[in-house]
UniProtKB/Swiss-Prot annotation:
Belongs to the universal ribosomal protein uS4 family. The gene is rpsD. NCBIfam families: PRK05327.1, rpsD_bact. It holds the Pfam family S4. This is Small ribosomal subunit protein uS4.
Length: 208
């Protein structure tokens, strides 16, 4: 399945909530959801209620697009989470949060997950002192993530770091801005992740 290439703003409007796909724009009055908080298209404002299946599908699509994954990747994470001990939905979100591209975004080294993915692919980051260029690389508690020294002058990284206070730093991460380095301290709890999603609907969708 190909990666979704439609307008990021249309994706957010379809889900009628901010998915923070366009970086700083999402925090401004230019955000499409702020101006038109209804699905795009001719009948966007008049759409009726979803069936149970429709709600499950919408929630699955919302989370998948939030993290920028294709269906095959997304389902693989779910299967992995389902095999783990504990609550499947929480396990699932934790796996997504452990991705290095997501952590680069959370630390404020990128303005969006899409930008973080691009930066990781171009080898701008180190994990425990070693270059990693695979966006799906999963971090473990105690792992450090730092910007390669030669990449610390990149405008997009520095602009993202300047805008970081708008988003705030999650409690499971630690950041030393002066050193361009962060630490994945511990696995996040569901409460700490504070995501506006209903992951149980995804569990129900894949459990059929």
């Amino acid at each position: 399945m190909a990666r979704y290439t439609d307008s990021s703003c249309r994706i957010c409007r379809r889900e009628t909530m901010k998915l923070y796909l366009k970086g700083d724009r999402c925090y401004s009055d230019k955000c499409a959801v702020e101006r038109r908080n209804y699905p795009p298209g001719q009948h966007g404002q008049g759409r009726g209620k979803f069936s149970d299946y429709g709600l499950q599908l919408r929630e699955k699509q919302k989370i998948r697009r939030m993290y920028g994954l294709v269906e095959k990747q997304f389902k693989t994470y779910f299967k992995h989470a389902d095999r783990q001990k504990g609550v499947t939905g929480t396990n699932f979100l934790t796996l997504l949060e452990r991705r290095i591209d997501n952590t680069v975004y959370r630390l404020g080294f990128a303005s969006s997950r899409a930008q973080a993915r691009q930066l990781v692919r171009h080898s701008h980051f180190l994990v425990n002192g070693k270059k990693v260029n695979i966006p799906s690389f999963l971090l473990r508690p105690g792992d450090s993530v730092s910007v390669v020294e030669g990449s610390r002058q990149l405008q997009m990284i520095n602009e993202a770091m300047e805008a970081m206070p708008r988003r705030g730093l999650p409690p499971w991460l630690e950041l030393d801005k002066a050193k361009y380095e962060g630490v994945f301290k511990t696995l996040p709890t569901r409460e700490e992740m504070n995501l506006p999603v209903q992951e149980q609907l995804v569990v129900e969708f894949y459990s059929k």
